[in-house]
């Protein structure tokens, strides 16, 4: 059987009411898009466990969910702050030049002059554009520990090769 690759898409929050409902914090671009990705898995004691969504709704601008088999507040409390994941295979294919953040994290970033600037450790959303957070190697010639490089495809980011986990950028190594 093929190993499942799980990506975190949200987190359960505190309980709501006495019948097992929980607040939900979605990491998807549109909060309610989290419900498009099924089935869900919960990370309990370091292991991904499948869970079935019974119902969801908005309440006072918050998302709340009811999970199948969770009918009491006390049981729901044990799931507070638990991460929600989905199998990567349920994500839609993207257009050319679009990438999922989880695919970019871990990529080596090299500028046009061939200088290895570091490895993408995380991504940031700024409103205007996404930003690569690049952790520099300890032997960085410019003394940098971290670089913030805007993910502007074609302008700054010239090439992304996911097979070799390499991102080529038009960016001065001194920044």
From Swiss-Prot:
Pfam families in the record: PRC_RimM, RimM
Ranges in coiled-coil conformation: none
Gene3D superfamilies according to UniProt: PRC-barrel domain, RimM
Compartments, as annotated in UniProt: Cytoplasm
Cystine pairs: none
Keywords, alphabetical: Chaperone, Cytoplasm, Ribosome biogenesis, rRNA processing
PRC barrel domain residues: 96-175
Major site of localization recorded for this protein: cytoplasm
GO biological process, one term: ribosomal small subunit biogenesis
GO cellular component, one term: cytoplasm
Top-level lineage group: Bacteria
Gene Ontology terms for molecular function: ribosome binding
Domain topic, free-text comment: The PRC barrel domain binds ribosomal protein uS19.
Its biological purpose: An accessory protein needed during the final step in the assembly of 30S ribosomal subunit, possibly for assembly of the head region. Essential for efficient processing of 16S rRNA. May be needed both before and after RbfA during the maturation of 16S rRNA. It has affinity for free ribosomal 30S subunits but not for 70S ribosomes.
Assembly and binders: Binds ribosomal protein uS19.
Family: Belongs to the RimM family.
Protein name according to UniProt: Ribosome maturation factor RimM
Species for this entry: Histophilus somni (strain 129Pt)
Underlying gene: rimM
């Amino acid at each position: 059987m093929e190993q499942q690759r799980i990506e975190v898409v949200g987190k359960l929050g505190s309980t709501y009411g006495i019948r097992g409902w929980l607040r939900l914090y979605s990491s998807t671009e549109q909060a309610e898009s989290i419900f498009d990705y099924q089935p869900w898995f919960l990370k309990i004691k370091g292991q991904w466990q499948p869970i079935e969504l019974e119902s969801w709704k908005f309440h006072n601008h918050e998302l709340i969910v009811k999970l199948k088999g969770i009918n009491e507040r006390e049981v729901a409390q044990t799931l507070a702050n638990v991460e929600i994941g989905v199998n990567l295979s349920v994500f839609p294919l993207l257009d050319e030049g679009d990438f999922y953040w989880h695919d970019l994290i871990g990529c080596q970033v090299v500028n046009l002059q061939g200088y290895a600037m570091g490895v993408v450790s995380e991504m940031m959303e700024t409103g205007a554009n996404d930003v690569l957070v690049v952790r520099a190697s300890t032997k960085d010639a410019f003394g940098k520990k971290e670089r913030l490089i805007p993910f502007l495809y074609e302008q700054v980011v010239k090439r992304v090769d996911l097979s070799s986990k390499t991102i080529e950028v038009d960016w001065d190594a001194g920044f």
